[in-house]
Each structure stands twice: as structure tokens, then as C-alpha cells.
Amino acid sequence: HSCLNDPVCLVMAVGRKYQLRPMAKSEFMNIPVLGWLLKKAGVFAVDRGKSDVTAIKTAIKYLKSGEKVLLFPEGTRVKGGVDKHGHESEAKSGAAMLAVRTGAPIVPVYIPEKKKWFRFTNIVIGEPYYPHVESKKGTAEEYKEIAEELMERIHALGAKAA
């Protein structure tokens, strides 16, 4: 995703019919008023600096109970395919791991980088799909392949939107 309001745009696009549980970096949850509002909106925190077992367990709990978890595959904001540190962006394996372990589908979503305030943003929601793995729980290599496929699907949605 490319800016801070992407989760808000997506939550508004799907409406109340598809309540999403967004995952946000833990630093946001510690901001006095914002953190309270995010918690009330169903957002849960992830500590991005390490494998956050609590966030993973929370996401698994939500998915197994039929809720929808919103996370961005790159794990950070990206502009022009480059993260804020100047590195080429690549998908993390979190979405793949959660889908494999819970049996939940992955829904690719394209949100354009260029948005105008107080204007409609054309968000493209792809078809849900279930990633395939050979091993029972999936391996790191399988998760990486699934994450790469997810990014390919997102880019294909972006090409359709253009």
C-alpha cells in the first residue's frame, strides 16, 4: 500500500457487509487518541520488527471464526515499487502463512498509488483463491511462492484498472 489512508479507503469500499479486521503496526496503537480509535474499529497490532506471535495468533483466531483480516503483503508503505528505505518492495509471507494454516482464501486487492482527497478512488477487488501447498503446514519456500503469486495477481488487477 502507498499511503496511510489505504486501509480506510478499503474499509469504506467494502462497507459494513464485509467487516474487516485490519492489522496495523504497533506504533499506531500507542498514539493516545488514535490508538483508542483504532482499537474501537477492530484494528489489531503487529510488531513488525520480529515474528509477532501474538499478532499471528490473533489473526488466526479471527480467520478461524470467519472474520476477514486486512493486511498489506509488503508490510509497509510502498511507492513506485520501492519502500521508504529505497529497497525494492517484495511481499512478506504473512498472508500466505495465515491462509495455509487457517484454510481462509486470499483476496487480492489493488489500490492505486495516486489518490485525490474527497474523490472516489477506484479500488479493484480480485477473486478469492486458495493457495496450494504440498506439505501439511506449508514451508517458508511455499509461503514465498504464494506471496509472489499474490503480488502478481495484485499487479494484474492494477493493469486492468489502468
Predicted regions and their residues:
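Soluble or luminal CAZymes and related metallo-dependent hydrolases
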Residues: 2, 51, 142, 146
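Acidic, metal-coordinating catalytic cores used for nucleic-acid/nucleotide bond scission
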Residues: 28, 52, 77-79
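Non-catalytic C-terminal accessory region of glycerolipid acyltransferases
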Residues: 56-162
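Catalytic core of membrane glycerolipid acyltransferases/transacylases, capturing the structured
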Residues: 1-50
